Amino acid sequence: MVVLCALRTARTGISRQIFSTQPAQFLHCSGARLIVADKDLLIKLRKKTGYSFTNCKKALEKFHSDLQQAEAWLHEQAHKEGWSKASKLQGRKTKEGLIGLLHDGNLAVLVEVNCETDFVARNIKFQQLVQQAAVATMEHCHSKQANTIDYTKSFLMAEEIKQLKTSLDNRALADQLALAIGNLGENMAIRRAAWVAVPSDWYIGTYVHGQLPADNPSLSKMMFGKYGALVVYRALEQNSKINLPELGRRLGQHIVGMMPLSVGSMDDPPGDDSETKMLAQPFLLDSGTTVGQFLQMSGVSVLDFVRYECGEAAEVGETV
């Protein structure tokens, strides 16, 4: 409780002092009589940007109640403050965070974004950053898939993801990351992303464990949690009794829980709980049956999967 209160106090102090490191002209006005900001405009600007009333008032006064210019200036100052804060916090460990999952038809994306504390991971501004990373990766996937109908799987590491542009304001994700760091006062990292695209007669199963509720309607298409899985599969035969989307969710649940390293072969002998080939593993939801046997009874074939665990050890060649 003491730690939680300290974190809340720290975040409150940061929000009150936003832009405090900016040049004097940002928070200091000339001795001439200031133009009184229209109350409705002030409330509107505050609601739209989330910045303090003090800074919204200064922006409106600076631009003579021009809402558009005031908003643009506030964002510019916030990005400068964010980069300054990011530079100061660089090197602090980011072991917490979220896995974000976005699924749209025959495309699906997993991203991992890290922060210092679980408290910040539950903040909507952090979740919006995860969403921006997922959407930017999805748009990148769309551009790569424009002229192909084949199955594709691809991975993006930190530096590649940060260069992607967001649809929000066409800024690079690196800028959005710096802005979030400035707003929330913790070091953060956009670590990695994976995406899969499948032909029209294939399926993508999705599952997130430790899922957080979407507290904002704008996040309704996202899934957030500490573990996430994508599984690619197809039906070998028509069976109206099989709920294929639900089957995909169960396979994703198995992948998260049993941590397979490869799909394996239907010819692999049944293994125990230490087995790493998915088809030979005991099925998580029915330990008396292997995954391979379950799929055979369902008339389904698994082709590939991706599993992410937030904060897991970096793979060879990966930088965090």
Where are these regions (language model features)?
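N-terminal assembly/interaction segments in proteins that build large macromolecular machines
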Residues: 2-11, 15-320
